[in-house]
UniProtKB/Swiss-Prot annotation:
Entry's localization field: Cytoplasm
Protein name in the entry: ATP-dependent Clp protease proteolytic subunit 2
Task of the protein: Cleaves peptides in various proteins in a process that requires ATP hydrolysis. Has a chymotrypsin-like activity. Plays a major role in the degradation of misfolded proteins.
Alphabetical UniProt keywords: Cytoplasm, Hydrolase, Protease, Serine protease
Catalytic center residues: S96, H121
Subunit organization: Fourteen ClpP subunits assemble into 2 heptameric rings which stack back to back to give a disk-like structure with a central cavity, resembling the structure of eukaryotic proteasomes.
Stored InterPro entries: ClpP, ClpP/crotonase-like_dom_sf, ClpP/TepA, ClpP_Ser_AS
Length: 197
């Protein structure tokens, strides 16, 4: 069930679902696994916010166990494509593709709340069928692993060898450890007060 927010104005009351209300503040929330549905929703919200004001930052809050690499790369590419800076904030858990998207925010604007957990690892996949089909799937997983590791290396400042070693198995970090690793830029406990224009 999605919570409803009631807003009063001189013209009466209006009801919004909580996500629509947050979107008015340029906040997008990824609070589930990365799927084609969640990715399409997030991409559409980012494109809408860019069209509305390409100069104002977007805030992506992430509490996700990860999910589809392809759908996550769609979000990632959109984050790089749009003009507004994207602040990323981990709330709870950013694991697998969730951690990748957390790290994909604008450099200097990637953060985590203090009790969150962040986990990176290699892409997961499985294959069945004929040997030739299994080889095709294995080659694709290896391609994705190399692509994700290269992006993580570029965005964290860690060597590719270090990223490959650390993503070989689940690698959990506290926010402070993730900051020292280069996945995020700050650990926050209170939202900064926004300047009034």
């Amino acid at each position: 069930m999605i919570p409803i927010v009631i807003e009063e104005s001189g013209r009466g009351e209006r009801a919004f679902d909580i996500y629509s209300r947050l979107l008015r503040e340029r906040i997008i929330f990824l609070g589930e696994a990365v799927t084609s549905d969640s990715a399409n929703r997030i991409v559409a919200q980012m494109l809408f916010l860019e069209a509305e004001d390409p100069e104002k930052d977007i805030y992506l809050y992430i509490n996700s166990p990860g999910g589809s690499v392809y759908d996550g790369l769609g979000i990632f590419d959109t984050m790089q494509h749009i003009k507004p800076d994207v602040h990323t904030v981990c709330v709870g858990l950013a694991a697998s593709m969730g951690a990748f998207l957390l790290c994909a925010g604008t450099k200097g604007k990637r953060s985590s709340l203090q009790h969150s957990r962040i986990m990176i690892h290699q892409p997961l996949g499985g294959a069945q069928g004929q040997a030739s089909d299994i080889r095709i799937q294995a080659d694709e997983i290896l391609f994705l692993k190399e692509r994700l590791n290269k992006e993580l290396s570029d965005r964290t400042g860690q060597t590719l060898d270090r990223i490959q070693q650390d993503t070989d198995r689940d690698f959990f970090m506290s926010p402070t450890e993730a900051m020292n690793y280069g996945l995020i830029d700050s650990v926050i406990d209170k939202r900064p007060v926004q300047a009034v224009a």
